[in-house]
Amino acid sequence: DWNNKIVVDVGAECGDTPLYFASMGAKVFAFEPLKKHFEFFKKNLSLNPTLSEKIIPINAAIGKDEQLKFYVATDDEHGTAAASFVSNNQGKNFKYELVDGYKLETARKKFDINHIDLLKMDCKECEFYLTDEDLKDIDRIKLEYTIRDKKYKLDDLLDLLKRNGFKCLIFRNGDRSRLSNRIAGNIYATKI
């Protein structure tokens, strides 16, 4: 039952997840940094006016309190797939897109988000900017992690979550060896 629950979606893209949780009764704060995705998101909201009343679309990134440079592909084949302010996943064919950024703690204060029932993150390494302070008053987290920069480690992310009272379950994205968990996957974390 998601009635009167608060969902924060970091990396909302076209808005499908916010629309789903709004249809289940939740109020959703949806952060999408990329202009192209945000325009599609707003279009989807306009096609669902009743549900859109429960969704607060925010054209910003979560990670750091500053203007962020996102690496975005310049060719149509890759579009905005895997765009990130943390790592260049685009190779040589990229451009920068400047985006307003907030630490999660700062965004919670700015948008008056006191308690989060579910934090959903799909943000291409921005999950590694989470802090102990960010994780206060959160019940559940579903995050997709991707590790491209070797300075980030899955164990560090799991330690942060466990230190803050979360029980974690890792789910692989595909049928690959367990070693692939170190590179990419999903973490489902529940406050215990």
Where are these regions (language model features)?
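Phosphate/nucleotide-binding beta-alpha loop and adjacent structural elements of enzyme active sites
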Residues: 1-192
